A protein has these predicted regions:
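Conserved N-terminal entry element of GNAT/NAT acetyltransferase domains
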Residues: 1-46, 205-217
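Active-site rim helix/loop that mediates acceptor-substrate recognition in acyltransferases
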Residues: 69-89
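Acetyl-CoA-dependent GNAT
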Residues: 83-122, 132
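Conserved catalytic-core motifs of GNAT/GCN5-like acyltransferases
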Residues: 106-108, 182-196
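C-terminal "cap" of GNAT-fold acetyltransferases
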Residues: 121, 189-217
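A short, internal acetyl-CoA/4′-phosphopantetheine-binding micro-motif in the GNAT/acyltransferase core
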Residues: 125-138
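Conserved acetyl-CoA-binding loop-helix of GNAT-fold acetyltransferases
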Residues: 136-152, 174, 178
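Conserved beta-strand-loop-alpha-helix junction that forms the acyl-donor binding cleft
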Residues: 161-173, 190
Length: 217
């Protein structure tokens, strides 16, 4: 069964109106170790898919991501990411133990990237810490800072890392602000009211929201 024919895959992937050259941008950097963490691409095998599916169906991750999907949809979602340059599924390990799931993606090819002055190499990511016992102690803040630093180092053409937490998610916003990202404003994307943040490479200008895309706070 081709589960991609049954479930919508990469629902946020949007490339209409983008220059052809932007679609040739390589996928986000993966497969790196930094600050005691290893960030590897998820493998489209049973072990990784079942692990990620179990994590993302836990109450604390389902609330934030709304990705509490059946196993078959997760299989289709991971395979679809690995087949494009838009997004990559990531398993984060510490001392050999898997502790988090992330998705690295090119913001210009994402639905949110159509709400601000995105550049073709802009990067973003989402984070889900697997064990609720690991939340609230600074792990998320550390992981954000680690990935931001690595992105700028590994991708010299990336001038901005743009993050888009739910506007009402105070914990996520604090993690982002502790890493010196700047709030660009709020936008509404589908059913979500999000706060858009950016951290730019030293010497680069902050991107701006596109006219008419700002949502009152």
């Amino acid at each position: 069964v081709n589960h991609a024919d049954i479930y919508p895959v990469l629902p946020r992937h949007r490339i209409d109106g983008l220059p052809e050259s932007w679609l040739g941008v390589p996928p986000p950097p993966t497969g790196f170790s930094r600050e005691g963490f290893h960030f590897r691409e998820a493998i489209a095998d049973r072990a990784d898919i079942e692990m990620i599916h179990a994590w993302m169906n836990r109450p604390h991750t389902a609330k934030g991501w709304e990705y509490d999907w059946p196993l078959e949809r997760w299989e289709a979602h991971i395979k679809a990411q690995l087949a494009t340059a838009y997004s990559r599924p990531i398993v984060v390990e510490r001392k050999g133990r898997p502790i988090a799931y992330m998705e690295f993606y090119r913001m210009a090819q994402d639905v949110v990237g159509h709400h601000y002055q995105a550049g073709p190499y802009d990067l973003s990511f989402h984070l889900a810490i697997a064990d609720p016992a690991d939340t609230g102690g600074g792990l998320g803040t550390t992981l954000l800072g680690t990935v931001i630093a690595e992105f700028f180092e590994r991708d010299p053409r990336c001038d901005a890392i743009v993050l888009e937490p739910d506007a009402a998610n105070g914990a996520s916003r604090r993690m982002i602000e502790k890493n010196d990202a700047v709030h660009l404003g709020d936008v509404r994307v589908r059913h979500r009211h999000i706060a858009l943040y950016a951290k730019v490479r030293e010497g680069r200008d902050l991107p701006r929201l596109l006219p008419g895309h700002s949502t009152p706070v």
